[in-house]
Amino acid sequence: MATPVPPPSPRHLRLLRLLLSGLILGAALNGATARRPDATTCPGSLDCALKRRAKCPPGAHACGPCLQSFQEDQRGFCVPRKHLSSGEGLPQPRLEEEIDSLAQELALKEKEAGHSRLTAQPLLEAAQKLLEPAATLGFSQWGQRLEPGLPSTHGTSSPIPHTSLSSRASSGPVQMSPLEPQGRHGNGLTLVLILAFCLASSAALAVAALCWCRLQREIRLTQKADYAATAKGPTSPSTPRISPGDQRLAHSAEMYHYQHQRQQMLCLERHKEPPKELESASSDEENEDGDFTVYECPGLAPTGEMEVRNPLFDHSTLSAPVPGPHSLPPLQ
């Protein structure tokens, strides 16, 4: 199935219009020059130089005679002159002389026309391209005139000047000039792409490094928090932690309760006190018999470093009670 052809863009339409206008202008110029009798009958100087002839003399309708290093053969072509070398009777072509003569004709044409360098470069390029088939034609004619006993001379000698001419034509600076702006533009675009890629990669590396640093910092903080929680935690999970304020409050309540109980016991002892006479008599009897009885009174005991224990309070929850300066012995 044929694919649909897209409509031409406005840019292409503009180019087509310019091309058509150029073709119309060229046709008009060709029609104007065709009216001249000299333009159709007498060829240009470049065509005459390619034919190895002189330029058209004034009022003539054909090129002039052959150049100095050429001679006209039976068919009317200008061929190189025969040069007999010592010891050999074979004719040898002089391509250097032919090229030099063509170059002289082109230089003479440039001087007469007075063209600028921009117009001379395409002419030189066209001459270099047209010299190659002219040289091959001269060598083919020279090979036909050789003796039939030496057929290998034409096959071995013809490709040598062909390669030299092609190398000379390809080494011209005219063919490399149109490629310079395109190469500069391509190099600039490549440099811009490389710079953009380097900036993007450096930004990505910076973001990755920042994220990695933040992650490491968070990991360290969590490790420190876990270590502090395990180090400061209780040895056994069943025993609750008691603050120092709670311990002091419990000790104050215990001391208050102890003082209250002591006051009550003292009051009861005062109401149930026996007569002093009986006590004195019994003490005398005991002293006489030598049997001594020791009584301990809580109020007379030293209270410097004595620990107070109240049976009504549970001391297992307290780690270590703070002994007060006025601690009293436990009740009995």
UniProtKB/Swiss-Prot annotation:
<keyword id="KW-1133">Transmembrane helix</keyword>
<keyword id="KW-0597">Phosphoprotein</keyword>
<feature type="region of interest" description="Disordered">
    <location>
        <begin position="145"/>
        <end position="182"/>
    </location>
</feature>
<feature type="region of interest" description="Disordered">
    <location>
        <begin position="272"/>
        <end position="300"/>
    </location>
</feature>
<dbReference type="Pfam" id="PF06809">
    <property type="entry name" value="NPDC1"/>
</dbReference>
<keyword id="KW-0812">Transmembrane</keyword>
<feature type="modified residue" description="Phosphoserine">
    <location>
        <position position="236"/>
    </location>
</feature>
<dbReference type="InterPro" id="IPR009635">
    <property type="entry name" value="NPDC1"/>
</dbReference>
<dbReference type="GO" id="GO:0016020">
    <property type="term" value="C:membrane"/>
</dbReference>
<feature type="compositionally biased region" description="Polar residues">
    <location>
        <begin position="153"/>
        <end position="174"/>
    </location>
</feature>
<protein>
    <recommendedName>
        <fullName>Neural proliferation differentiation and control protein 1</fullName>
    </recommendedName>
</protein>
<feature type="transmembrane region" description="Helical">
    <location>
        <begin position="191"/>
        <end position="211"/>
    </location>
</feature>
<feature type="signal peptide">
    <location>
        <begin position="1"/>
        <end position="34"/>
    </location>
</feature>
<comment type="function">
    <text>Suppresses oncogenic transformation in neural and non-neural cells and down-regulates neural cell proliferation. Might be involved in transcriptional regulation.</text>
</comment>
<keyword id="KW-0472">Membrane</keyword>
<comment type="similarity">
    <text>Belongs to the NPDC1/cab-1 family.</text>
</comment>
<feature type="compositionally biased region" description="Pro residues">
    <location>
        <begin position="322"/>
        <end position="332"/>
    </location>
</feature>
<keyword id="KW-0732">Signal</keyword>
<feature type="region of interest" description="Disordered">
    <location>
        <begin position="312"/>
        <end position="332"/>
    </location>
</feature>
<feature type="compositionally biased region" description="Acidic residues">
    <location>
        <begin position="282"/>
        <end position="291"/>
    </location>
</feature>
